[in-house]
From Swiss-Prot:
Residue stretches of biased makeup (Polar residues): 1-12
Name of the molecule in the record: L-tyrosine C(3)-methyltransferase
Signal sequence interval, chain numbering: none
SUPFAM superfamilies: S-adenosyl-L-methionine-dependent methyltransferases (SSF53335)
Pathway where it operates: Antibiotic biosynthesis
Stretches assigned to coiled coil: none
Length: 366
């Protein structure tokens, strides 16, 4: 069964600019792809320099005024404003600059900082490792990990040796989850759940949101030992140490704790191969009682294999960097793994989330 919270149609961008993924590609769209890395650097620079906040607070500034406010030399200011206007992030009329409508609206919401955290993740976690994307495809492995200092077997076991990257990573993961877990809280019926196991729960962002929305549940977070102190800190800050506990361990090599009637994988199964996902889901199946449920919550690509575009672009990171496998898999790929793990396809439920991120949930019952 599929539940769609919002139907959207992807078509040609009437204002020009990046291709939307459905209309025929023209030369302007191809040029956007060719110079896409440069377009992102304009976005990142504008975020780090707080250009957008400046124009939110002082709309209509002139070029010299913006340069003075940002402390930029004339040439540097010319470059920044050329890029910001050419990409459509700003508009200029009679020499006065304004925010694009989409940015002006986003800045009014709590999602603005989450968006900026996503920009920081792309800059400080993804960018360097994605240089090795082609070689990662050739070798079918995450070659970009070689650019991250440390000896851990994957990115997650190296983050603690790279403080700036670690900070950017966990800020992003919290923000990326928050962009979607408001919908998770709305649609996920946990009335029949008493104890939830959050596998790879990171800094507890999803367990905290679900516990706050469902006062009757308790949660355990299975997380690797280097991350466990951060997890415990976030739980304590939320005042939920009496209801959420950390279970240090490795979900691949350790047995799952028992006594839970729901197992959740949030933003985890995009990291590993389908075979590894099947093994994890089988461990969840074995740990669950009859009637217990498994929840897969992360970004999804469509079953046709042609989008959404954010799912496609996000897959570059998963191919090149974190672990030796992973991408934004399709709904059907997860359902195949669930079936191989022992779950009955007749129990599967798809929930497609609204918004610009391609998030969704699959629920299966033992």
């Amino acid at each position: 069964m599929t539940i769609s919270l919002e139907n959207t149609t992807v078509g040609q961008n009437p204002a020009g600019g990046p291709p939307t993924g459905k209309a025929p590609l023209d030369m302007e769209g191809l040029a956007w792809i060719l110079f896409g890395a440069s377009a992102f650097q304009y976005l990142n620079a504008a975020c780090e320099l707080n250009l957008f906040e400046l124009l939110e607070n002082k709309p209509g500034l002139t070029k010299p005024q913006i340069g003075a406010e940002l402390g930029l030399a004339d040439r540097a200011n010319d470059i920044l404003l050329l890029g910001a206007t050419a990409t459509g992030m700003l508009t200029v009329e009679d020499g006065r600059y304004q925010l694009a409508t989409v940015l002006a609206e986003l800045l009014k919401t709590d999602d603005w900082q989450r968006f900026k955290d996503t920009v920081g993740f792309e800059q400080y976690v993804c960018y360097e490792g994605q240089i090795d994307f082609t070689e990662s495809l050739r070798s079918n492995s995450n070659v970009g990990l070689r650019r991250v200092r440390g000896s851990g077997r994957d990115l997650y076991h190296r983050l603690h040796e790279n403080p700036q990257m670690e900070q950017a990573f966990y800020k992003y993961m919290r923000s990326w989850s928050e962009l979607a877990n408001q919908h998770l809280v709305e649609v996920l019926d946990l009335s029949g759940t008493s104890k939830l196991l959050d596998c790879g729960g990171g800094d507890a962002v999803n367990s905290i949101a679900l516990a706050q929305a469902n006062p009757h549940i308790e949660a355990g977070i299975l997380e690797i030992p280097p991350t466990a102190p951060l997890t415990e800190k976030k739980i304590a800050e939320a005042g939920l140490s009496d209801r959420i506990t950390v279970k240090p361990g490795d979900m691949h090599t350790d047995e799952f704790p028992t006594g839970y009637d729901t197992v959740m994988f949030a933003h985890q199964l995009v990291i590993w191969t389908p075979e590894e996902n099947t093994a994890l889901l089988r461990k969840a199946y074995n740990a669950l009682p009859e009637g217990g449920r498994v929840i897969i919550f992360n970004s999804m690509s469509n079953d046709e294999g042609d989008g959404p575009v954010v799912a496609a672009l996000d897959s570059v990171y998963f191919a090149a960097l974190p672990a030796e496998g992973g991408m934004i898999y399709s709904w059907a790929t997860y359902e195949e793994s669930l079936t191989k793990a022992g779950f009955n396809p007749e129990t599967f439920q798809r929930i497609d989330f609204p918004g610009w991120t391609p998030h969704g949930v699959i629920i299966a019952t033992k």
